[in-house]
Amino acid sequence: MAELDDQFETTDSGASTTYPMQCSALRKNGFVMLKSRPCKIVEMSTSKTGKHGHAKVHMVGIDIFSNKKYEDICPSTHNMDVPNVKREDLQLIAISDDSFLTLMTESGDLREDLKVPEGELGEQLRLDFDSGKDLLCTVLKACGEECVIAIKTNTALDK
């Protein structure tokens, strides 16, 4: 009998990109969806219960992909959506002419679907890579979006 070598591509499980959490349970430096964008909470304050209802929670968050500031106020008993945020360090292999990164996962698979980040981080990444440093790129994934948010020198190499 011939040996079967089936190759299955991994796909999204179809799980929700967010989960509900009561507003009063959210914390500073946590994540929350503000104006349908995944944000990191940078400021939170609670107002007292008024004569017409619930205590209110005022939140200020920074979009984890665009760094835009968003604000929202909601009753402390209401549920807010919290994004499922996944963080992964990938080894930088190459940078293409059209600014796409070639990254290697821990399992050895190559990814070529992420662009060099805009601004200072992108410039630093190019400088360090061109000077021959072995780099790890920290990739943040939430709500179907991904981007490189940080770089660091790979110290785990066998010398």
Curated annotation (Swiss-Prot):
- Segments forming a coiled coil: none
From its record, what is one biological process in GO terms?
A: positive regulation of translational termination
The molecular function terms of the Gene Ontology recorded here are: ribosome binding; RNA binding; translation elongation factor activity
The chain residues annotated with the modification Hypusine are: 51
Pfam assignment, any one: eIF-5a
> Where is this protein found?
Cytoplasm
* Keyword RNA-binding listed: yes
Q: Which CDD domains match?
A: S1_eIF5A
How this protein is processed and modified after translation, per its record?
Lys-51 undergoes hypusination, a unique post-translational modification that consists in the addition of a butylamino group from spermidine to lysine side chain, leading to the formation of the unusual amino acid hypusine. eIF-5As are the only known proteins to undergo this modification, which is essential for their function.
- Per UniProt, which keywords does this protein have? Cytoplasm, Elongation factor, Hypusine, Protein biosynthesis, RNA-binding
Which N-terminal residues, if any, form the signal peptide? none
Null allele phenotype:
Severe larval growth defect.
Gene Ontology, cellular component aspect: cytoplasm
Q: Record keywords: Protein biosynthesis included?
A: yes
Which family does the entry's similarity section mention?
Answer: Belongs to the eIF-5A family.
Q: What does this protein do?
A: Translation factor that promotes translation elongation and termination, particularly upon ribosome stalling at specific amino acid sequence contexts. Binds between the exit (E) and peptidyl (P) site of the ribosome and promotes rescue of stalled ribosome: specifically required for efficient translation of polyproline-containing peptides as well as other motifs that stall the ribosome. Acts as a ribosome quality control (RQC) cofactor by joining the RQC complex to facilitate peptidyl transfer during CAT tailing step. Functions as a regulator of autophagy.
> Which protein, by its recorded name, is this?
Eukaryotic translation initiation factor 5A
Q: What is the organism field in this record?
A: Drosophila melanogaster
Organism phylogeny: Eukaryota, Metazoa, Ecdysozoa, Arthropoda, Hexapoda
